[in-house]
């Protein structure tokens, strides 16, 4: 059971209109034959899988991509009838359930096809199982690596009375978000070499994650897996500029729960790692590393009533402390991600401070923090 903190003043706010705008801007770059499938894995990158999926559908997304079968089942349970592709490997034992729920699976080995076919036959499943063949062109994660392996799989899928529907074929580029396109070109050449053995391509041919779609449009195929950019986050971080403005959808706010005057020489938080050099005002914010706000963010800053305030002392499990410029009333707004007045703190800012990527920060926001949606 997940307990959501409905009775404390800390929340994630998700702007669904920003998500719709990002999708609309992306679709405006494509021809009308190219479909956009919204990637809503990992609880919609921390934004909320069901609410994001609904917004994406309203904006024109015609399908969804997830990482695990349970995410696809959650979408079906919520009433979504659109195509859903599970991008990770699903155990063959679940093939009958997948076929029943009309879900598509990524497949990367002949052994998987052989095992799943036997299981489908043993369970007398007559509904075809939708398959997208994954090609490993250089990501090194999952997929067929040689033309011979791929040709064998295609032959299996096209046998008479096959229990499979050969619905799609795809790859994933590892460096599409980098200015140096050397390795991208290497992968693209591998893709062309592999796919040449498929004499008749399936309905969906897709190579584009957000980065590929933004900066390598010439090889888009006929479907885009629109992921992190859907949420208004630049997949390249600060290295490449997006061809159109991305609107971040997520903000994280709280309110001060305690304010005190700290005397010079007094310390704050575990380990007494911060000691006041002079008398100062300290505010307590009801969020901590159990909420996904990293312990390593000591020394970073938040916005209190539009002013930057440093996080002092170690971030605790459920609370953190900030140094205030002056006495501020309990209940004052604290912005941890987002804009207050003329100042902004982005997920990218936090990621830079933590030495990671904004994906990790967004996905790490715990379900204990309630999500509030505006549209």
Swiss-Prot record:
Keywords: Isomerase, Pyridoxal phosphate. Catalyzes the interconversion of L-alanine and D-alanine. May also act on other amino acids. Its EC number is 5.1.1.1. Gene3D superfamilies: Alanine racemase, Lyase, Ornithine Decarboxylase, Chain A, domain 1. This is Alanine racemase. One of its GO terms (molecular function) is pyridoxal phosphate binding. Pathway: Amino-acid biosynthesis; D-alanine biosynthesis; D-alanine from L-alanine: step 1/1. One of its GO terms (cellular component) is cytosol. Its cofactor is pyridoxal 5'-phosphate. GO terms for biological process: D-alanine biosynthetic process; peptidoglycan biosynthetic process. The keyword Isomerase applies. It is an enzyme of class 5 (isomerase).
